[in-house]
Amino acid sequence: GRGSGMEKLAIVVPCYNEEEVLKIASEALRGVLDDLIHKGKIAEDSFILFVNDGSKDRTWELIEEEHQAHPVQVCGVKLAGNVGHQFALTAGLITAMDLSDVTVSIDADLQDDVAVIEEMIDKFHNGCDIVYGVRKERKTDTFFKRTTAQGFYKVMELMGVKTVYNHADFRLMSKRAVEQFSKYQETNLFLRGMMPLIGYQTDCVYYDRKERVAGESKYPLKKMLALAFNGISSFSVKPISMILGAGVIIVILSILAAIYALISYCTGHVVPGWTSLI
């Protein structure tokens, strides 16, 4: 049962052109598994699942090398093409769902602190089905990145999309939480907007975000804006309400203008324009 230390953990890592960090990430995450197994908190056959999202570099070759060197602890999934971070992460979670009891998703750049995975597992053992990794501060981000990220969460909030502030996709999910998530038929995936809808007991762990160990950020402004659009269009009726409201106001103003023009015409005060043509 839960808390017995027999639960099998799968650490799901979406990868897109991560050849510079993959070996470092694998070593760090294997260290986490070894530590948790040694402490009796997870099953001995717990593993890391790297999801190759159509990388153009040597990412997949390195995943294969890691699997050959560590066949129990490292596995890989190769997607047919580049489907994007959210779909790659979803593919990894659904693959891991049948192979594990609990999952932790984390990006390959290791900016999220792997040390708090133990705290996530402890909260899982205490009954939580979803544990969010939340950044305390964004000191390592550039001013531009920090400002756009804060703007992202503010827009989400204004549009009525429920998200956990300063949480990206570093989270623990129990098997039943992943099963519940897999039932959603969303085409515009925005996982951090979907998680609060699942229900079940949730909690947070807090950590300081680090700088990338190597390589470049895979979330430039363009992708961030696309993610925001997906979140708003998938989880908020506010844009529809706003468009509907604007439409109603325009119709009312048009009717009032037509009535005014007609009255002016009938009383002889011709408004220059179309009423003089009647």
Which functions belong to the PLM regions below?
Residues R2-G3, R192-I278:
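Hydrophobic helical membrane-anchoring modules
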Residues L79-G81, H85-T95, V102, V114-L191, ...:
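Acceptor/aglycone-binding surface of glycosyltransferases and processive sugar-polymer synthases
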Residues G31, D35, E65, A69, ...:
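Conserved amphipathic alpha-helical interaction elements at protein-protein interfaces in regulatory
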Residues C75-V77, V164, D203:
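Structural signal for short hydrophobic segments within the conserved structured cores
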Residues G5-T142:
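Structured catalytic core of nucleotide-sugar glycosyltransferases
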Residues Y16, H70-P71, Q185, L189, ...:
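Residues at alpha-helix boundaries and short interhelical turns
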